[in-house]
C-alpha cells in the first residue's frame, strides 16, 4: 500500500494505492494480483487492475495469463467547471509468457498478448471520442547479470499491431488517427555498481511508428517515471524517446555507522541520488514541431525493512529545457510513502 503526490491537478495530485498479490492460490504455482488507485486533490479519478497467471507443466517456463484494467476520470471543477468531462479507458488481455532461458546469469522471456482496448471522452453529456481497438503484441525481454563488470542489464522489445478498429466514426479529439497501426517499443536499463555503496543507473525508453496513433498507444512524457521536471503526461506523441542517468549513494561518509533504528547500518536506511532526464516526442503528421523536454533533480529514500518494508521517497526536479511546464511550476517535488505487509 502507498500514498503519493505523483498525479496532476487534472487527474488528482494525491494518490492512494492498494495492491494485493496471492501466490499459488490453487496450489499450481499460479499468481493472482489486484490493485486499485484513488486520486484526489482537487479532482478525483480511479483505476483498478486484475491479473492471473498459471504455469503449464507440459513446457518448462511456459505460463498463460489474462487480465484487465480500467481507469475513470471525471473533471468538473476550476476553469472546467460545468463541462462535466469524463474519460474512462480500459484494457482486457490474454496471452502467454515463455522463459526459455533461465540461468543464474541470463534469463530470456518471450511473450504474446491479444488486447482489446477502449477509451471514451465526454463533455456536457456528448461523446467527443470513442476509440476501440483489437491489438496483437509480441515481445521479448532479457535480464543479464554482468559479473565481469559488476552490473545488471535489462532489455525489452515489443511489436504491437492493430487487428481491428471498432471506433466510432466521429472523433473530435483525434480525427487524424489511423485505423491500422504498427508500433515498436524498446526499453533498456543498465545498473552499474561502482562500489558497495555507489552505483549508476541508465534508463532508455523509446517508441517508433509511422502511423497517427490513438491516445492509448501514444508515447507519454512527463511525471515521476519520465522527465521529472514536468507533470505527468505533459506531452504525447506517435514517436518518442526518453533517457535518464542517475547516481545513487548509500549514506555517504557514515554508511557503516549504526543508526538509532535497532542498530541497522545507515547504508541500509538512507539512499541519496541525483539525476538528469531528457526526452523528445514527435507527431507523424508533422503539424507540430517536436517537443524537447529535459530536467535535473535530486532525491532521498529512507527505508526501514524491518517495519513492514516502510519506504519514504522524496525528490525534487527542475526543468532545464525551453519548454515551459503547462502548470507553470519551476520546481516539482515528489513524495511517496509505501508499506508491504
Model features per residue range: what roles?
Residues 1-5, 32-38, 50, 66-72, ...:
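Transmembrane beta-barrel strands of outer-membrane/channel proteins
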Residues 1-64, 102:
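Outer-membrane beta-barrel initiation region
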Residues 4, 21-23, 51-55, 67, ...:
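Transmembrane beta-barrel domains of outer membrane proteins
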Residues 172-341:
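C-terminal transmembrane beta-barrel domains of outer membrane proteins
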Residues 62-215, 281-284:
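Transmembrane beta-strand segments of outer-membrane beta-barrel domains in Gram-negative
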Residues 31-39, 44-49, 77, 82, ...:
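Transmembrane beta-barrel domains of bacterial outer-membrane proteins
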Residues 5-9, 37-41, 79-85, 123-131, ...:
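Outer-membrane beta-barrel domain signature
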Residues 25-31, 57-63, 101-108, 145-154, ...:
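Short loop/turn motifs that connect adjacent beta-strands in outer-membrane beta-barrel proteins
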